[in-house]
Amino acid sequence: LSRCSKSPNRGDPFSAAKVGLRALDGVRLTVRKGTSLAVVGESGSGKSTLLRVLLGLDRPTGGRALYHSKPILEGRASGIAFARDVAMVYQDARGSLDPRMTIGALIAEPLRHFDIVPRQDEAARVAQLLDRVGLPADAADRYPSGLSGGQVRRVAIARALASEPSVLVADEAVSGLDVSTQAQLLILLQSLQRDMGLTLIFITHDLGVASFLCEEIAIMYLGRIVETGPTDAVLGAPSHPYSAALRAAAPQFFEPLSEPLPGEIPSPLNLPAGCRFSTRCPKAQDDCRLKDPQLGKLGPQRAVACLHPLQPQ
């Protein structure tokens, strides 16, 4: 993404575009091939809009969204190739599956759409995909309603893998599950990413999940990325006060819960002057309320949007 911004469609009578709302505001983000990236932030931070732009479901109103240095979905042929190469695992996995279709038919659908294998080889390919995600071959004859929450997530992953993608995008793919099922799915995603050489983009609000699964992390606040870098480095020694606040809010064994951030999240329709985190930042100084910090390099692998980055202790 190159300085991507996204405002509501002006043709929408309920749009807030007239008052300057930007769900994304000048976002710069590069995902390297074969790596895993976690996008983390509170509700309303812009994660969902970022996801839609990454998938080509929304076009940015400013800046560019590129895939292999070419604009996403430019032309019909490239759009079909992009849809095959970039697969999605939705947060509502059960809702993404047609309840009237068997699991086998659901997984076979992208095989046919993208002409992956001959029709006579579909059943064998479906069985391979089910095995890859840890489900028995006879699951192909069942319906989504007969599966548990964890099994449905595995089916959604198998269906995403059917098109033989290079990039797998997962939106809160383990949320709402018990801890043991979450752990099993995270281990599955980790092994798939490693064994298949996938590029993984994982949207989450859970820092523990991000730390376990992803090599790199991007932290969002009110439509902007405020810090990026290797996950261990960012979570081990955050440079942005918001990153530090998120880490402090995550439950830790044998440690008392930290005090929540003061104040309320500003309305995106009425952003504060200067740094948009200044109204809640415990480290804010006078210039933070005047200058709007941009994402800038902080060492060879990290970047932060802060006038006074935190220093490692």
Each predicted region: which residue ranges?
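P-loop NTP-binding/switch modules centered on Walker-like glycine-rich loops
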Residues: L177-E259
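ABC ATPase NBD coupling module
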Residues: P13-K18, I72-A87, A105, H113, ...
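Helix-to-loop junction immediately C-terminal to a conserved catalytic motif
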Residues: L55
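Charged, flexible cofactor/metal-binding loops and thiol motifs
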Residues: R10-S15, G20, P230-Q313
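Conserved ABC ATPase signature
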Residues: Y143-L147, Q151
